[in-house]
């Protein structure tokens, strides 16, 4: 059940015997993809989002269980093959026909976690609200404006901005032709160039223990 505004998140319970640990978002996503649902996180953007707690969780002892949503991702590679993956924190998509990294061209961040590294990219989001926060930077946004926005990202004060669009969605689809292929990152892992992407938010797919 997704969290609603004003409700408490999580519950205190006895930690189960099938706990596994994840020190990064990619490792957390891999556990979920393998069908493991009870996870202790010790690093990554999701870990920071839930409070960066360093407490040791022991099976059979009392701990806090936090349900989270995950993102089921399907994308099409350059060779037209279709790949399905799980992501837990962030998805980054950037056209490959612009040079200059994030300083040039459009940029899309789909966030389930509040943070992307040191950046507070989704201050209004929650990892168990049944939605993702989609932030899209317009390709016409200048370098100086981007540098100014970056300086504000650490505090989440980069919004609102007329050239940065934000949406809260249950599903997200991005399609492009061969002339506008995108580079894709899932939870910090580079997936290569893609020509299509779809994301479905799945609620209560894992429980983080702290």
Task: Identify the residue ranges that each predicted region occupies.
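Catalytic core of DAGKc-family lipid kinases
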Residues: 1-114
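A general structural signal for short secondary-structure junctions and capping/turn motifs
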Residues: 61-63, 98-101, 123-126, 163-164, ...
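A short, structural micro-pattern
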Residues: 65-67, 101-102, 126-129, 166-168, ...
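Exposed beta-strand and adjacent loop surfaces of beta-rich binding modules
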Residues: 68-70, 131, 181-183
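Short hydrophobic-aromatic micro-motifs
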Residues: 84-93, 106-119, 132-136, 174, ...
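Glycine-rich, charged/polar anion/phosphate-binding loops
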Residues: 89-98, 116-122, 157-160, 184-186
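Internal helical hairpin/lid segments
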Residues: 102-157
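ATP/nucleoside-binding phosphotransfer catalytic cores, i.e., glycine-rich phosphate-binding loops
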Residues: 136-210
